[in-house]
């Protein structure tokens, strides 16, 4: 009788743990993964991956708390950190059909300003990105977008 109780308890434990793992889904841990942002170049590369390749891992740690994004157009818009992070998380896995080029405009031990150009078939998006060293990691603190 004790063996039967132990068998049912083991089966119940296996069933519960299987359902718990299935509820998380295969990509649940990937979005919470830490990314290496120890250099400005790594942070810039990750920013480009997030904006153009739908990379969602490490999005929360990529942007500074006071991050601000401005979009220059006839109807200028501004977005804060939480709005941008939420938007990028929704775009998980979506790849942009564009050619990407990056140019470092200015760089020091504490900050970097880069120009990221996305050339699409009918228009070009230019993104001026400011990155800052905050502690041991680099974070994106500002982004200004324009379209041609």
Give the positions of each predicted feature.
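Surface-exposed, charged secondary-structure patches
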Residues: 32, 82-123
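Short, well-ordered alpha-helical segments enriched in acidic and aromatic residues
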Residues: 54-70
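Short beta-strand edge/turn micro-motifs at domain boundaries
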Residues: 25, 124-148
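Short, low-complexity N-terminal intrinsically disordered segments enriched in polar/charged residues
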Residues: 4, 20-53
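Bacterial N-terminal signal peptides that target proteins for export
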Residues: 1-9
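A short gly/proline-enriched turn/hairpin at secondary-structure junctions
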Residues: 68-77, 93
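A mature extracytoplasmic/lumenal domain signature
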Residues: 63, 73, 117-120, 129-133, ...
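N-terminal signal peptide c-region/cleavage motif recognized by signal peptidases
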Residues: 15-18
């Amino acid at each position: 009788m004790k063996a039967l109780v132990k068998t049912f308890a083991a089966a119940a434990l296996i069933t519960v743990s299987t359902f718990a793992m299935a509820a998380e889904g295969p990509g649940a841990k990937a979005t919470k993964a830490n990314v290496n942002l120890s250099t400005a170049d790594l942070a810039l590369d990750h920013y480009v991956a997030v904006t153009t390749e739908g990379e969602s891992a490490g999005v929360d740690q990529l942007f500074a708390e006071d991050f601000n994004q401005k979009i220059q157009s006839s109807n200028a818009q501004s977005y804060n950190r939480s709005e941008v992070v939420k938007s990028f998380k929704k775009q998980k896995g979506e790849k942009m059909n564009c050619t990407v080029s990056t140019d470092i405009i200015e760089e020091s031990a504490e900050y970097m300003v880069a120009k990221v150009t996305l050339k699409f078939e009918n228009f070009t998006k230019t993104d001026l990105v400011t990155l800052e060293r905050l502690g041991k990691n680099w974070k994106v603190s500002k982004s200004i977008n324009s379209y041609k």
